Regions:
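Short functional linear segments
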Residues: 1-53, 60-62, 66-71, 78
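Short active-site-proximal "capping" loops at secondary-structure junctions
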Residues: 55-57, 82-83
Length: 138
């Protein structure tokens, strides 16, 4: 049995590992992501709103986040890509997730994925799911 390498201790370490690991070939479909998410046992009863389309997703998310926060809800928001720092992608109650929360999220995904290959985006999305499950948004 191959010994598993130690997980990075920093957010920069995780991002570098994921960039290095990501291959040129991407398998389409959500089956791999769903399987890893189920193994993570990061359950959440939060309402999920998906915003898609070509233009205006960031503005729409910012507006929804602002409305929900002003209404007293606990809100998680996941967007991509980031502008300056990876932390911008994952927000809890209008604040960027801290490095420690993201590192814990990446580690949880890594522990659950086994031999399942994930892209940079998929790993990051599942890490965000873990951060949200821990934060318990409405």
């Amino acid at each position: 049995m191959a010994e598993q390498a130690a997980s990075p201790a920093s957010l920069d370490g995780w991002l570098a590992l994921l960039e290095q690991r990501h291959g040129q070939r991407v398998e389409l479909g959500l089956e791999r992501v769903a399987a890893v998410r189920a193994r993570m046992q990061a359950e959440s009863d939060a309402v999920v709103i998906t915003v898609g389309g070509t233009n205006g997703k960031g503005s729409c998310c910012a507006m929804l986040e602002g409305i929900l926060l002003a209404s007293g809800y606990r809100v998680g928001c996941y967007t991509s890509p980031h502008l300056l720092r990876y932390n911008e992608r994952v927000r809890i109650d209008g604040r960027d997730a801290d490095d420690a929360a993201l590192v814990a999220g990446f580690a949880a995904v890594e522990a659950a994925r086994g031999d399942t290959a994930l892209t940079y985006f998929e790993h990051g999305t599942l890490a965000a799911w873990q951060v949200f499950a821990a934060a318990r948004p409405d």
